């Protein structure tokens, strides 16, 4: 099923609870805060929502019911989605398919999570190891960083510049976990986590929530919603790993999924104005930027240094601060990306605004095994 083979699908309301270090705040409060903000942003009542999908990874079973009943017990179908880091990206995809196929006119896609008691190496990524703790993702990406530096003949400062850019963006985002600018010296001088990777080159985990409302044309008209703020979802693509025969299978997975999503949307990579990608580690941004076709092979470090990926550059990458600064509470991360892309395409991102944004892309990888990519377009493009 291609999204554009069916009814047009739009994002009309967005909401977030700030991503933050673990607190005593209940997940219910986190989630309800985000959903209420999305409803207010859309200008609609909870009673208009016809179905809900919630992405989460660490909260147990049937998370949606005790959370959403605080908004009203309306009898709507609720589905919980777990797909590692791509959990709420997958929830959003399911919401889009519901609306596109005509099963519902208004669907909530949300994400919520709270940090659990895991070791520091696991906390850096939000992904629990499957080998008894002998290997954690930070080691994997440290090795990829070493290989990238060797193949590209560059030093550690090249990867550190990703963290500098994204912390600058995060400092302008009131929802971000990390809201402080960092210099190149601060990043390079920070505590090492694995290999050459420093703490500030690894995403923080914590807690938070995100929510978006997905609607049809019929819902916009019936509910009297503001069509000028409706951002269209042009494509929704999800793939799983194949036998790529490559050193970094998640890079190959990103390449194939992005190519498919752009083709379904009917646009080229060079038309993208804003991108939110899976930068759990700084090295990932360089790898995925090249895999997505946003620059040529081996060119990401040079274009980053030239400001091509900064806000105001050729294409703004991770203007929210990305996973490195916005944070990666896992469950909310994917829908949080959709919220940022929507804000950018509406021209409502304030000091983070990428000028004249028409097309945006959101990308997440789940445990290296699944990849979800969405392409969105501004109203009246």
Please state what every model-predicted region is.
Residues 1-86, 148-155, 178-183, 196, ...:
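Conserved active-site "lid/cap" helical segment
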Residues 4-7, 55-110, 114-128, 133-141, ...:
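Conserved catalytic cysteine-centered active-site region
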Residues 259-282, 291, 323-326:
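Extended C-terminal subregions enriched in glycine
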Residues 82-112, 138-172, 212-218, 326-349:
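Active-site-proximal alpha-helical scaffold in enzymes
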Residues 1-25, 161, 192-256, 260, ...:
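Condensing-enzyme catalytic core mediating Claisen C-C bond formation in acyl metabolism
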Residues 58-69, 245-249, 279-302, 329-331, ...:
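Short glycine/threonine-rich loop-to-helix capping motif typified by GTGT followed
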Residues 11, 46-55, 77-83, 107-111, ...:
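Beta-strand segments within the central parallel beta-sheet cores of soluble alpha/beta enzyme folds
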Residues 23-24, 118-123, 171-175, 225, ...:
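Short acidic, glycine/serine/threonine-rich loops at helix termini
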């Amino acid at each position: 099923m291609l999204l554009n083979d069916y009814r047009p699908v739009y994002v009309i309301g967005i909401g977030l609870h700030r991503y933050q270090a673990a607190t005593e705040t209940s997940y219910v409060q986190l989630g309800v805060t985000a959903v209420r903000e999305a409803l207010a942003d859309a200008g609609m009542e909870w009673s208009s929502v016809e179905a809900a999908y919630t992405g989460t990874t660490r909260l147990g079973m049937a998370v949606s019911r005790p959370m959403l009943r605080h908004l009203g017990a309306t009898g709507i179908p609720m589905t919980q989605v777990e797909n590692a880091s791509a959990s709420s990206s997958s929830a959003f995809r399911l919401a889009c398919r519901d609306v596109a196929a005509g099963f519902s006119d208004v669907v909530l896609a949300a994400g919520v999570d709270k940090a659990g008691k895991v070791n520091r190496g696991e906390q850096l990524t939000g992904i629990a190891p499957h080998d008894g703790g002998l290997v954690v993702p930070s080691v994997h990406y440290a090795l990829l960083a070493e290989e990238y530096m060797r193949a590209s003949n560059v030093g550690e400062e090249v990867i550190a510049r990703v963290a500098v850019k994204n912390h600058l963006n995060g400092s302008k985002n009131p929802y971000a976990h990390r809201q402080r600018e960092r210099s190149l010296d601060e990043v390079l001088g920070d505590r090492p986590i694995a290999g050459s990777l420093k703490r500030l080159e690894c995403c923080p985990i914590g807690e938070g929530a995100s929510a978006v409302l997905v609607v049809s044309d019929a819902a916009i008209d019936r509910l009297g919603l503001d069509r000028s703020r409706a951002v269209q979802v042009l494509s929704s693509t999800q793939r799983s790993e194949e036998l790529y025969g490559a050193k970094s299978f998640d890079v190959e997975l990103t390449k194939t999924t992005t190519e498919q999503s752009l083709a379904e949307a009917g646009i080229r990579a060079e038309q993208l104005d804003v991108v939110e990608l899976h930068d759990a580690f700084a090295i990932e941004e360089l790898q995925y930027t090249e895999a997505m076709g946003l620059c040529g092979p081996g060119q990401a470090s040079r274009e980053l240094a030239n400001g091509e990926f900064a806000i105001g550059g050729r294409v703004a990458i991770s203007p929210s601060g990305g996973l490195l600064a916005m944070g990666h509470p896992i469950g909310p991360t994917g829908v949080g990306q959709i919220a940022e892309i929507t804000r950018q395409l509406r021209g409502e991102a304030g000091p983070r605004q990428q000028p004249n944004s028409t097309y945006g892309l959101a990308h997440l990888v789940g445990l290296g095994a699944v990849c979800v990519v969405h392409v969105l377009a501004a109203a009246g493009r």
